[in-house]
Amino acid sequence: MNRTVNGSGMKRMALLNDLSCFGKCSLSVAMPILSACGVETVPLPTAILSTHTADGFGDYVMRDMTDEMEAFAAHWKRLGIRFDGVCTGFFGSVSQLSFARQFLRDFADPSTLVVVDPVLGDNGALYGCFTDEFVTAMRALCADAQFITPNRTEAALLAGCRIDAPVEELLEKLPVPNVIITGVHRGEEIGYCARLNGVWMEIFKPCLPGTLHGTGDVFVSALCGELMAGRAAAEALPRAADFCDRCVRATAARGEAHWYGLAFEDVLKEEREQ
């Protein structure tokens, strides 16, 4: 029997990111959210971790997946698998970033949605595991994307600006068609500042106390779901921001016991029951 791996009619998205087995971030967030959006997900783990890396878990176990990534992609290429979208997150080395660019050359075409969440740093500093060479390589990957979703620190690193540069300057200097800067604080609010095909947009929500892990991953996953459904960027952004805000509030309702990630399952369950 001849079988085809393409043509089912369901949108398919490759997810290049780490898998943290406990805790909610990266692939463990992206796969269920995108599946709920009707998108077929194909994960390609860049690393596998016992937990995510937040304080509270102690010494986590991590395995690099570079060799497996290359072998998996080679198999997919032999099968002729195509993707309607590619979303990338954490990479552990410059060689993995080079692989990601080759992956796009092998599996993407001009119609493929490419979203890069450029994991580099936070709170004004580059993560200690990364170098200036890594930032340069990430900048090159971002140039291949239609959308990037850096936080303010990552936007400054990519733009080559000082960390406290105005958001407007960062948006102006990042040469990607659609840039969404996440986690922007304004008084008692937190939100997103974006340049979407030359149009500026901002969305802010009341900021709740405390630190929540995986918020950016939930937002990016929801954004990809909206974009894969064919919604324009100016419609997809507020819808994804609203979903993320609902997840934050659902998590707050669960209290300290759910400190390790967003309770996005509660929101997906609510939507299913409506």
Provide a role label for each language-model segment.
Residues 126-201, 210, 231-234:
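Conserved phosphate/ATP/ADP-binding segment of small-molecule kinases
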Residues 234-274:
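Charged C-terminal helix
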